Amino acid sequence: MDPSPDRRLPVTVLSGFLGAGKTTVLNHLLHNREGRRIAVIVNDMSEVNIDAGLIERGEAGGDGGPDGGFSRVEERMVEMSNGCICCTLREDLLVEVARLAGERRFDHLVIESTGISEPLPVAETFTFEDEEGRCLGDLARLDSMVTVVDVARFLDDLGSVDDLAQRGEHLGEEDERTVADLLVDQVEFADLLVLNKTDLVDADRLARTEDVLRRLNRGAELVRAERGRVPLDRLLDTGRFDFDRASEHPGWLQVLRGEEEPETEEYGIGSFAYRRRRPFHPQRLWDAVHAAWPGVVRSKGFFWLASRPGLVGEWSTAGPIVNLGAVGTWWATVPREEWPADRAVRARLERDWHEVYGDRRQELVFIGQDLDRDALVARLDAALMTDVELAAGERAWWGLPDPWPRWAEDELQRHGRHGRRSSLAA
C-alpha cells in the first residue's frame, strides 16, 4: 500500500547577502511559475522595503502585467518589514505560514529572508512551537534552503573585515557579526547555491569561486545564473532539504570526520585537519592567532587551552575574522556517573579517550587557497605546551600568562557565534 501523499505546504527559503540578487531570482520565478499557485513572504530589514516594492510593481524583471506578472487571486504576498525572520519574527512567521498553509490553495510558498539573516534559525522555525503548542512542521515542510551568491563580490566580501554595522546593516547595537561570518553561515547551511551574476566575471574568477564554495559546503548543489534566471525545477518541489544532512554539509566537518578528500586541488583550493592531544599555551596561541594566516579562507573546530583546562574552546574563522569562545566543558571534567546513558555517545567517548587527558584535544580544519600546510602546522605546534610545561601539572597551568578575554557563562549557551572576535593580520 502506497503511503499517503504529504499534503503539507512545501516551502523554499531564499537567503543571500544584500545585493546578491535574491529579489531578481524571486521575480524570475514568479514570472515563470508554469501554472503553479505560489505564495510569497518577503522580509526586508530596511526602513523602506524597496525589494517588496519592486516585486509589487514588477520592476525587477519579467514581462508580466500590472501586478508584476502574477495574479493577486492566485498569489498572495505577505510583506513582513518589521524585523528579521530568525529573531523577532519567528512567532509571526509561524502565524503567517500556518495561515497560508491552512488555506490549502497554494502549491508552494517562497520565503525571501532578509540579507542579514542566517538560514539555520529560519529552518529551526519549522520545529518551533508557540504557546498553544502549534508546530509549523505539522502544516508546512521545508523543501529547499537556497542561498544566492554574488560571484562578482563573494571572494572580496569573504576577505573583508567589515562588520555588518559598517555596511549599515545590523540587528542592533549587540549585533557584532561580520560580513565574512554571515556569508559563511549562509553558504554552509544551503542545499542549493545559486551563483548569480556569472556574466559579470571571467571564467577564472567564476571557477575559483565555485571551488571555494564546494570546499565550504560539499553537500550543496551548485547552479550558475545570469540575472537571477534559475530553472524552476531547481527551486521548487525538489525534496532536497533534510535538517540532519544540512547540519553535516559544512566542508570543515567532513574533513574533521576523515571523509575522502578530492584527489586534485583545482586553483590551489585545499583543506587539512590538525589534530593534537596536548593543550595550547595561552600566550603562544594568542601570538599565533594574531599573526598572518596566508591563504586561509575558513577554519573551524575545537581547541583546548591549558589555562582553562575544563572548557571546550570553539575555533571559527571566516576570511580574516577569527572568533574564539567557549562551547561547553570536556567530559574529562565530568564524573562518569553523569555521562549520557546513550550507548552510542559513550562508545564515541571511549573511542576518543586518552588515558591522561580524557577527551581533551585539538581538532581544527583549515580550508584555503595555496595553503602552506607545513608552515601552519609548525606554527600551531609551536603554540602547544612543551614537555616541561606539561610536567608542571594542571595546578601550574592556571598561572600561565593568559591574554584571552574571559569566556563568559553566556558564551557557553551562544556557542561563541556572536562572541568576541579579533581580526587576523593581513
Spans of model-derived segments:
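Nucleotide-state-sensitive switch-loop elements of NTP-binding domains
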Residues: 2-15, 20, 24-181
